[in-house]
Amino acid sequence: MAGCGEVSHSANMLPTNKKLVEPCPNSAPSLSVPECAICLQTCVHPVSLPCKHIFCYLCVKGASWLGRRCALCRQEIPEDFLDKPTLLSPEELKSASRGNGEYAWYYEGRNGWWQYDERTSRELEDAFTKGKKSTEMLIAGFLYVADLENMVQYRRNEHGRRRKIKRDIVDIPKKGVAGLRLECDAANVNLARESSADGADNMAALGASSSQPTPVLPTRLHTSLSTTASHALSHSDVTSSLENSFAQLQIGDPVIGRNNIGEGEEGQPLINARMPAPSALLEESEPSDSNDHGSPTLQHNSLLVPQSNRLPFGNP
C-alpha cells in the first residue's frame, strides 16, 4: 500500500503542465512503414490489394505472374491491378522521381529509361562506390546480376537477355520508377500487362507490329496448255486449231513467268519477257498421243518440217 501511495504521490507532485505521456499536438502522427510478407522487408512503394493486404509493388508483380493471387489469402488479383495499382503513398513516388540532385540508377526500357526503386538504387550505388565489378539484385522475385563494368543487367539463370543500365542524376527525364509510371505518362499507359519483371514495356513492340496492315499478295492464274490444246485441235480444220493454240499461249506459261519473277512479285505483270519461237510453242501444244487424231495430225506435223527439208512445189 505504501508503494502505491508513493507512486501516486510522486505522480501528483509533477507540475500540472507536464504529464507522463503527453502527445505533441503539433506533430503529425508517425506512420510506420508496413512490412512485406513476400520479401520480408519494409515495403518499397507499398500497394494495397482488394483484400486489404499490403505488399511491395514489385513483389505483387512477381507473385501475380505465378498464380495471380494474394500471397496470404489467395484471393484473386484483378487483371488491371498492375496497370492501376492502389498506392498507399503516391507522394513517395513523386519524391523518388524528383530527388535532391543526387545520383540514381536506371535500366533501359522501350523508348526511355526506368529508374530503379530506392532500395535497389542504394545497393547499386554502394557496390559502385566500393569498386565492385558486379552485384546481385532481387527484383520481383527474380535474381538479377548487374555487371558494373559493361553496365548491363541480366538474370542469373538467363545470361542471353541483357538490358543496359546507367548511373545518372535523378532529375533526368524518365518513364517512371520501378515499373510505376509517372502521372505525365498515365494517359499513354498500355492496358496490356508488361512482360518484363523489372517493368520494361516489351509489349509495345507487339502492339506496333499488330497495327501495321498485312500485305496480301495476288495469285496468278495458271493455265494448263496440254489439256486446253488437246481439246482445241479439230479434225476438220488444222488452221483454226493453231489459232486457238496461239490464243492460249499468249496468256503466259507459268514456267517462263516463274523464272523472271522474284520473291513476292507473283502478281506483277511481266516486263520484257522473252517468248519462245512459234515452232517450239507448237511442239509444246502438240498432244503426246498422235494415234487418236489420225491423218490431220500428220498434216499438222508436216507444218513443223524445216524449210530446207521440204520438197519444192510441183515435185511429187
UniProtKB/Swiss-Prot annotation:
Coiled coil segments of this chain: none
Q: Which UniProt keywords apply?
A: Cytoplasm, Metal-binding, Nucleus, Transferase, Ubl conjugation pathway, Wnt signaling pathway, Zinc, Zinc-finger
An example molecular function term from Gene Ontology annotations = zinc ion binding
* Protein residues bound to a glycoprotein: Y107, R110, W114, Y144, Q153, R163, K175
Q: In which pathway does it act?
A: Protein modification; protein ubiquitination
Q: Name one GO biological process term.
A: protein K48-linked ubiquitination
Q: What is its EC number?
A: 2.3.2.27
Bias kind Polar residues: ranges:
293-310
What cellular component GO annotations does this protein have?
Answer: cytosol; nucleus
| UniProt cross-references to PROSITE patterns, sorted A to Z | WWE (PS50918), ZF_RING_1 (PS00518), ZF_RING_2 (PS50089)
Catalyzed reactions: S-ubiquitinyl-[E2 ubiquitin-conjugating enzyme]-L-cysteine + [acceptor protein]-L-lysine = [E2 ubiquitin-conjugating enzyme]-L-cysteine + N(6)-ubiquitinyl-[acceptor protein]-L-lysine
Main localization is cytoplasm
**Region called Disordered, residue ranges:** 257-316
Give compartment(s): Cytoplasm, Cytosol; Nucleus
Query: What residue stretches are annotated with the WWE domain?
Result: 91-167
Q: What does this protein do?
A: E3 ubiquitin-protein ligase that specifically binds poly-ADP-ribosylated proteins and mediates their ubiquitination and subsequent degradation. May regulate many important biological processes, such as cell survival and DNA damage response. Acts as an activator of the Wnt signaling pathway by mediating the ubiquitination of poly-ADP-ribosylated proteins. Neuroprotective protein. Protects against cell death induced by DNA damaging agents and rescues cells from G1 arrest. Promotes cell survival after gamma-irradiation. Facilitates DNA repair.
Report the domain remarks.
Answer: The WWE domain mediates non-covalent poly(ADP-ribose)-binding.
What is the protein name stated in its UniProt record?
Answer: E3 ubiquitin-protein ligase rnf146
Query: Which organism is the protein's source?
Result: Xenopus tropicalis (Western clawed frog)
Gene for this chain: rnf146
